[in-house]
UniProtKB/Swiss-Prot annotation:
GO terms for biological process: riboflavin biosynthetic process. The active site is at residues 126, 128. Keywords: GTP-binding, Hydrolase, Metal-binding, Nucleotide-binding, Riboflavin biosynthesis, Zinc. This is GTP cyclohydrolase-2. It comes from Shewanella baltica (strain OS185). GO terms for molecular function: GTP binding; GTP cyclohydrolase II activity; zinc ion binding. Its EC number is 3.5.4.25.
Amino acid sequence: MSIKYVATSKLPTPWGVFAMHGFEDTESGKEHVALTFGTLSADEPVLGRIHSECLTGDALFSLRCDCGFQLQAAMQNIAETGSGFILYLRQEGRGIGLLNKIRAYELQDKGANTVEANEQLGFEADMRKYDMIKPMLEQIGVKHVRLMTNNPRKVKAMKEFGIEVVERVPLQVGKNRYNEAYLKTKSTELGHMMSEYHFMDENK
């Protein structure tokens, strides 16, 4: 994998003005983005998140997942902290792509869970790769991270690429009656670290 830095621009948001850094994977043609806020330290832990693209949750306000809620919460947390980053990776549908994600949703509408749906389509439960995070973090000057995630695979990926994860910061937001089963599957079958908050019934 060859990641090339392309350009940086300002990105005004409801939480403040971020910097948007564009990257291209010259082998696959995929385009990735790093958002940064404030001054990032190479010596001190920086609050950050690895976020995989989710068109339905991030842009279309879907309640089937917690992705959009997590993205907004991460941006707000970073702004309130005063500095931080988000690596926005173009890996829709845990790496299977948008149309296959819609096919998986169709199977879920018929009773399959999120893992079963992927497997019925001939995919692994999670097809995402994280090779691009090292050159992206090198470009923005981050070596030590307070990582906002519930996913142990992201913690492992950072450590494998020589990035110190000083702290895992839970990001448990967005539970609702449409995604309760999905969240439970992420916990029980994909190993995501979640508290009982996600399994209470107050929003039914």
